[in-house]
From Swiss-Prot:
Residues 510-523, 1111-1136 have a biased composition (Low complexity). Pathway: Cofactor biosynthesis; iron-sulfur cluster biosynthesis. This is Iron-sulfur cluster assembly protein SufD. InterPro entries: Fe-S_cluster_assembly_SufBD, SUF_FeS_clus_asmbl_SufBD_core, SUF_FeS_clus_asmbl_SufBD_sf. One of its GO terms (molecular function) is 4 iron, 4 sulfur cluster binding. Residues 500-525, 938-970, 1111-1153 are annotated as: Disordered. Keywords: 4Fe-4S, Apicoplast, Iron, Iron-sulfur, Metal-binding, Plastid. Residues 961-970 have a biased composition (Basic and acidic residues). GO terms for biological process: iron-sulfur cluster assembly. It comes from Plasmodium falciparum (isolate 3D7). It is found in: Plastid, Apicoplast.
């Protein structure tokens, strides 16, 4: 048999022996006691007898029976029967003898120490066990000493000796060894101590030996071989031992904590507690490898450890250096020696100095190989892949597909467009496949995406929460998350009043003991710590007094546990929970001390808030929303928030990665720019005022004006009579003397307070008052052109005729306001800028408003005259006031233009609900109270009818139930709009919590036979079965967007919630939800404008930069010649400048200036050249005439690209109606980043929802949005979206309904420049009599690209279905492109209608020509055509501001067009 096979068999034989691999777990600490300790825990139950003879795998040299040890010493000293010969013979039987030194080891050490590697066997053993420096201190006994073993020559002798050793172990008696080793922790300590005792040396130096197994086998095999065989042997053998060789071969850290000698007088419990302590080194393998500069550490195994950066804080420069050196992809010197191009990544790392507590920047750089570009045809056809993986066309079977760790793996990324054949390495990870230097990249393929694309590392590690602290994630316990539902009932029982009363006395005793401990210890948080286990209490003991107190506590806890032995379940719960809670709270308090009571780590956020010790907000300095959950870990909502994040992380792992080719074909977008961006969490911290959001808020036409057009003729007949009444009322000014004070052109008053103000005529052109407070303000005619009041508070305001041109009220608070025309106080009206009228051309519009029917009249003499006039005028105008407003014919068009705001606007800033920017909550509270009163009235009526039918005996019982139900219903809220963390009702929280976990195409897998098909041709077979849903097939489902939605859930900060109860009609009102995406680019723009005013603010500091440079080899001669030529050209330019200046300017003063300038330029250029030449000469000497590399700057990342994850949940109960308007905006058009949105909408039976969505983000923003709808029985859902902004936007709409439901979808997208907007729609018909109507339109200009795909699936049970889909897209110029793909999948035959279509065309020429014949220019004619094309979608939108923005963008398209001749 050849020697090569022998070596392999020996290696496998040793691997199969027990506990061989276990040793590698403890090599890191280099403490062999841990090997024995692990066996001790597993074999505590085994009791050894004298007759038992253990095998090799059960052999153990550690034993902790101290009682027998004492007896043995006493017997030996008393009798002295044991002689030296008997001892000598026993040791021979056990282990053998070598020159008087007795070898005694673990079973693995025993084998390898006794192997006769050479003929000089005795000398080897003497070298091993002879120790130097015997006079060392005993504490240094655990220092490491390497074995020095000579190389073996004969392999056959090794085999024979191993078999002999195994046979000897079977016949050994273990009790004899135990009696001799009881006093020592290790076998080696025993024999070394005996030698020291024989030599009369009291100082003991204990050796612990480190067996380098890999070096042993490597030396055994490689010796006495030829050089050729040695090379082959090394390559073959390193395949088996590569991991161990890199990680464990040279790792020898020193343990900081060292075990002291164990005293014989200690108890068994103390000994066990010391055995349980494992001496694990604080040194990391990476740090140790960096200290030893012999060989650089470039293995790929530790990159997974490095990828978890977000769990640690790199605040020191040394840690940053370690991270940089571990991430160096290539060695610069070796790469330059090969004359290959490479890239340098320079990054300025921002860290915090722990001493000064200031943010500083530290620049570092690392090197990455540059891949060579080439031309290749990218298509979806399969290609032949060779087995060597060295060809550039390596697609499917590339090892990079298996080694990449990112979710966006190389399988789902591809590029399209003109530049698809020229791609750099740092743009897309698919370039690994197109590399000539493929063998060099195998070394870095495991962490390729992490280092080439920091944004992918950022997405996968879910580092999107800037507010959340990293330390909190380390503190959280999975125990509370897993056992929350199971222990909920038991906790209620434990916290019941009976149990609390019994435990009050015990708590008082514990508090007294804790107070005593605080006087002795430095830890101020020992009050809350209740030690339960000996392990936790023995760790931190300050003084002897503390130890006595701890023992006193143990006795108390044991007494309490003895009392509760009846209920074992309660005992387990109480012990586990109290243990976890005390440690958890203690760590939180230490965490607060670490940051000096500042909860947040980021300096910017710390300056914005003030806290208590509890973490509660005291005072807000800035208007930036931060939920209290991030500050209070004890909040019950904190647990639910962490569960949401963990469920998103698990879903992200479970969702399969889609196929590269299929996803690229579906996406139809060049993803190169997406992977080129460096995403971060750089959101803006500036104050956003409400005035900035005025243009983006809703502007709705009031429908009451349209209804009054029918009554215009009746109003005109009564207008003359009203005018006469006004003239009569003007003559009655003398009735009240106090009114004369108010008859003036300009009345300015800050505070006007009057209990009773009675006036028939109040005439004022300008009345300006900040605060007008009056209990009773009675006036027949109040005429004012401009009345401006900030705060007008009045209990009763009675006026028959109020005539004014412009009334601007910021805040109007009325206690009793009863409008006959059904106008609520929540709706505030405002006028546009076009309605301003000059003082010269004033026109009175008579508006008769009957504000209140019940008037509060005082007992005054003047009021009697007023009451008579009031009654006469009321009778005349009673019929008119009940029907509608009185309008003048000249101002009917003006009244139609009056608008109203949305009922309530909710603002979400960077994924967090902002209560400051949103409207007042009292608006919702007032509406909630009104709805509750209506529901009570309706219930009382129903109950009365039921009680009449029932008997008197039954009435008593029913009344009690009715009262209880009413009491619960009053607590329930009928409407809720706000943050999920502010929900207080249990029912609302339960319903919305279900919908938060929903992820499209992942949560739907609960259906039968809907598992996704990832490989093979299973997708075709799924069509044969009715129960299978091909919608979730691998070829049809969109797993890429499912990953984005799971990422949104994993990085959730807050959630906007809209809830509506049953039987509520809010079809007249709109709820507007605004999602703002900010960036620090806005802060930079504001700072440039306000540098003089804001010099003291430290919030806006220098941010990190990220640059990429390309290094290309070049010849030295060319560079030198180019430098000299540039230097000569500069001199010539200076001389030419001097000549021209002499000719033009004859003044001597100007000549001297020009000469001085040129002289200075020459000096500077010559100085720079000398420095460059010196550097070149030095580099030439060092590099030994190697090629020089020129550096070219490729990219520069100064812009900030934040990631925001907005989330919306809408839940509408049965028989209710509501209008929701969702808008995504960015206040600065130059913003960039990623907006990953998700909205979930649920409808119950017979509900109606109108949902509009507008997207107006920055020009460089990537927008991905999932909209999932669950339509109810006989419910109606209408979806309208308008897409205007962003660089690339994609919207997925998925609707699933029930029987008799109806859904409508209307969309519009306007594209310009290089925008890419795509919309994907899915309508799934699973139940009968469902109806869908869909229409989408596109206007594409410049080089933009539009994508539309719809899919309608009708299952077998969905009978009598209606489905209509249509897309119309218009290309305005050459270079624009569009893709429209409608699909239908129909299984049943009983269908009423199913249509689909798509058109892509230019603007029609015939209607444009017909408009031009009527004198209209070509641009205006095209604008008219585009407006008519867009109007069909805009008719479904009620926001006038959004319509105006659409028309403005259409006007841009028309102006870009160049005229042409027909």
């Amino acid at each position: 048999m050849p020697n090569i096979f022998l070596s392999n068999y020996i290696f496998i034989f040793i691997l199969l022996t027990n506990k061989f691999l276990k040793t590698f777990d403890y090599v890191e600490s280099k403490h062999w006691n841990n090997i024995c300790l692990k066996d001790l825990y597993d074999k505590n139950d085994i009791k050894l007898n004298k007759t038992n003879k253990l095998k090799l795998k059960y052999k153990n040299f550690m034993f902790s029976d101290l009682k027998k040890q004492k007896k043995r010493k006493e017997t030996e000293t008393a009798t002295g029967t044991i002689t030296q010969k008997q001892k000598h013979t026993k040791k021979k039987k056990l282990h053998g003898q070598t020159n008087g030194y007795f070898i005694k080891r673990n079973k693995i050490q025993h084998i390898f120490a006794n192997i006769p590697y050479n003929n000089n066997f005795k000398k080897i053993n003497q070298d091993i066990y002879t120790f130097k420096n015997v006079n060392y201190h005993p504490k240094n006994a655990n220092k490491k000493v390497y074995l020095k073993i000579n190389n073996a020559t004969h392999l056959e002798t090794i085999k024979t000796y191993i078999t002999k050793c195994i046979k000897n172990y079977r016949h050994q008696n273990e009790e004899k060894t135990q009696k001799k080793i009881r006093n020592y922790n290790n076998i080696i300590q025993y024999y070394v101590s005996r030698k020291n005792n024989n030599n009369n040396n009291n100082n003991r130096f204990i050796h612990t030996y480190n067996m380098l197994f890999i070096n042993i086998f490597y030396n055994i095999i490689s010796k006495n071989r030829n050089e050729k065989k040695k090379k082959n042997r090394k390559t073959d053998f390193q395949k088996y031992l590569r991991k161990y060789e890199e990680l464990y071969q040279k790792f020898t850290p020193e343990n900081d904590a060292e075990n002291n000698d164990i005293n014989n007088d200690k108890n068994n419990s103390d000994l066990i507690s010391q055995i349980n302590k494992k001496n694990i080194s604080n040194i990391i393998i990476n740090e140790w490898c960096l200290r030893n500069n012999n060989e650089k550490y470039n293995s790929t195994l530790m990159y997974d450890y490095i990828s978890n950066m977000h769990n640690t804080e790199y605040q020191d420069i040394t840690c940053v250096n370690n991270f940089i050196k571990n991430n160096e992809m290539i060695e610069k010197e070796t790469w330059e020696h090969k004359q290959k191009p490479y890239l340098t990544y320079k990054y300025e790392f921002k860290y915090r100095d722990p001493i000064n507590r200031k943010n500083k920047l530290y620049q570092y750089e690392y090197y990455i190989p540059k891949l060579i570009t080439y031309e290749e045809d990218i298509s979806t056809e399969p290609k032949f892949v060779p087995s060597n993986f060295k060809s550039p066309k390596c697609y499917n079977n590339s090892p990079v597909n298996a080694l990449t760790t990112s979710g966006f793996s190389s399988r789902n990324i591809d590029t399209f467009g003109k530049e698809r054949n020229k791609i750099y390495s740092f743009n897309t990870p698919t370039d690994v496949k197109r590399n000539i230097f493929f063998d060099d990249l195998i070394l870095i393929s495991s962490s390729y995406n992490q280092h080439f694309f920091p944004n992918l590392n950022f997405l996968l590690n879910l580092h999107t929460l800037q507010i959340l602290i990293r330390d909190k994630t380390a503190i959280e316990t999975d125990y509370m998350i897993d056992k929350f539902d199971q222990l909920k009932e038991k906790l209620i029982q434990i916290n019941s009043p009976h149990v609390i009363d019994n435990n009050q006395n015990d708590d008082i005793d514990n508090n007294n003991n804790n107070n005593n401990n605080n006087n002795n210890c430095d830890n101020p948080y020992n009050k809350r710590i209740i030690p339960i286990n000996n392990k936790s209490t023995n760790n931190d003991a300050c003084t002897i007094d503390n130890i006595s107190n701890i023992q006193h506590r143990k006795n108390q806890t044991n007494d309490q546990n003895n009392k509760s032995k009846d209920d074992e379940i309660n005992e387990e719960i109480s012990s586990n929970l109290t243990y976890k809670k005390t440690l958890f709270d203690d760590k939180i308090q230490l965490f607060k001390n670490k940051y000096d009571k500042n909860i947040l780590d980021d300096k910017d956020f710390v300056q914005l808030w003030k806290y208590n010790e509890k973490g509660e907000i005291v005072e807000t300095i800035n208007k930036i929303p931060i939920p209290k959950i991030y500050l209070n870990i004890d909040d019950p909502k904190y647990l639910s928030w962490k569960i949401l994040q963990n469920s998103g992380k698990t879903a992200f792992k479970e969702i399969p990665t889609p196929n590269r080719k299929l996803e690229a074909w579906r996406q139809q977008v060049n993803l190169k720019t997406f992977y080129k961006q460096n995403f971060d969490s750089s959101i803006s911290l500036r104050n956003i005022s409400k005035e900035e959001l005025v243009d983006y808020k809703m502007k709705i036409v009031d429908n009451t004006f349209e209804k009054n057009e029918k009554v215009q003729n009746d109003i005109s007949d009564h207008f003359d009579n009203i005018k006469m009444d006004n003239q009569q009322n003007e003559e009655k000014v003398e009735l009240n003397e106090n009114i004369n004070y108010y008859n003036s052109d300009n009345i300015n008053g800050d505070n006007i307070n009057g209990d009773n103000i009675n006036g028939d005529n109040i005439n004022g052109d300008n009345i300006n008052g900040d605060n007008i407070n009056g209990d009773n303000i009675n006036g027949d005619n109040i005429n004012g052109d401009n009345i401006n009041g900030d705060n007008i508070n009045g209990d009763n305001i009675n006026g028959d005729n109020i005539n004014d041109d412009n009334i601007n009220d910021d805040n109007i608070n009325d206690v009793n306001n009863n409008h006959n025309n059904n106008h609520n106080s929540d709706n505030h009206y405002y006028y546009g800028d076009t309605h301003k009228i000059n003082n010269q051309n004033k026109k009175n519009v008579n508006e008769t408003i009957n504000i209140s029917e019940n008037t509060n009249m005082d007992d005054n003499n003047n009021n009697e005259i007023y009451s008579q006039n009031y009654k006469e005028q009321r009778i005349k105008n009673q019929d008119i006031s009940n029907n509608a407003y009185n309008f003048n014919k000249e101002h009917i068009d003006k009244c139609k233009r009056k608008y109203k705001k949305a009922f309530y606007t909710l603002v979400v800033r960077d994924g967090i609900v902002d209560e400051y920017l949103s409207d007042d909550i009292n608006i919702l509270k007032n509406l909630d109270n009104k709805l509750k009163k209506k529901s009570e009235i309706n219930q009382n009526k129903e109950n009365e009818n039921e009680n009449e039918n029932n008997s008197q005996s039954d009435n008593n019982t029913t009344k009690q139930h009715i009262q209880d139900e009413q009491g619960t219903e009053q607590k329930k809220s009928k409407i809720f709009v706000g943050s999920f963390f502010n929900v207080k009702d249990v029912e609302i929280e339960y319903l919305i919590n279900k919908e938060l976990y929903f992820i499209p195409e992942h949560s739907n897998w609960y259906k039968t036979n809907t598992q996704p098909f990832i490989r093979g041709q299973i997708g075709k077979q799924s069509r044969k079965f009715d129960n299978d849903y091909p919608i979730y097939d691998y070829r049809k489902s969109d797993f890429g967007m499912a990953k984005f939605s799971s990422l949104n859930l994993a990085s959730i900060k807050d959630c906007a919630v809209v809830y509506l109860d049953e039987n509520i009609d809010l079809s007249d009102k709109f709820i507007h939800v605004i999602f703002i995406a900010t960036s620090k680019n806005e802060d930079i723009d504001n700072n440039n404008n306000n540098n003089d005013n804001n010099n003291d603010n430290d919030i806006y500091e220098k941010q990190s930069k990220y640059n990429v440079y390309e290094n290309i080899p070049s010849n030295n001669k060319q560079t030198n010649s180019n430098n000299n030529s540039e230097y000569n050209n500069e001199q010539n330019n200076c001389s030419n400048k001097q000549i021209t200046n002499d000719e033009q300017n004859d003044n001597e003063y100007e000549k001297e200036e020009s000469i001085q300038k040129c002289h200075m330029e020459k000096v500077i250029s010559s100085h720079d050249d000398t420095i460059q030449n010196c550097d070149i000469e030095k580099n030439e000497c060092k590099e030994n005439k190697k090629s020089k590399y020129t550096q070219i700057k490729l990219t520069e990342y100064h812009t900030h690209n934040p990631i925001t994850n907005p989330r919306l949940v809408v839940y509408v109960k049965g028989n209710s109606k509501i209008n929701i308007y969702e808008s995504h905006i960015s206040l600065n058009k130059s913003n960039s980043g990623l907006v990953n949105g998700f909205s979930r909408i649920c409808l119950e039976e017979k509900s109606n929802v109108k949902h509009t969505l507008s997207q107006e983000l920055g020009n460089n923003v990537w927008h991905f949005h999932n909209v999932s709808v669950k339509n109810g029985l006989n419910a109606n859902y209408k979806f309208v979206d308008v897409l205007l902004g962003s660089l690339s936007s994609r919207i997925n709409l998925q609707i699933e309904g029930e029987k008799g439901c109806k859904q409508e979808s209307y969309g519009l997208s306007l594209l310009e420049d290089k925008q890419n907007i795509s919309q994907y729609e899915m309508f799934h018909h699973e139940h009968p009599s469902m109806e869908t109507n869909q229409l989408f339109k596109c206007l594409v200009s410049d080089k933009a690209h539009a994508v539309w795909r719809s899919r309608g699936r009708i299952e077998r049970n969905a009978i009598k279905a209606k489905l209509n889909t249509l897309c119309k897209s218009i290309l305005l110029n050459f270079g624009a492109s569009a893709v429209c793909i409608p699909t239908l999948e129909i299984i049943p035959s009983d269908i009423e209608c199913a249509n689909h279509g798509a058109t892509i065309s230019d603007l029609e020429k015939e209607p444009i020509f017909s408009l031009m014949t009527r004198g209209i220019s070509e641009r205006n004619a095209r604008e008219i055509m585009m407006n008519s094309f867009v109007k069909e979608i805009l008719d479904h939108i009620s926001d006038e501001n959004l319509k105006n923005r659409v028309y403005q963008k259409v006007l841009k398209f028309s102006q870009k067009y160049k005229s042409s001749t027909y």
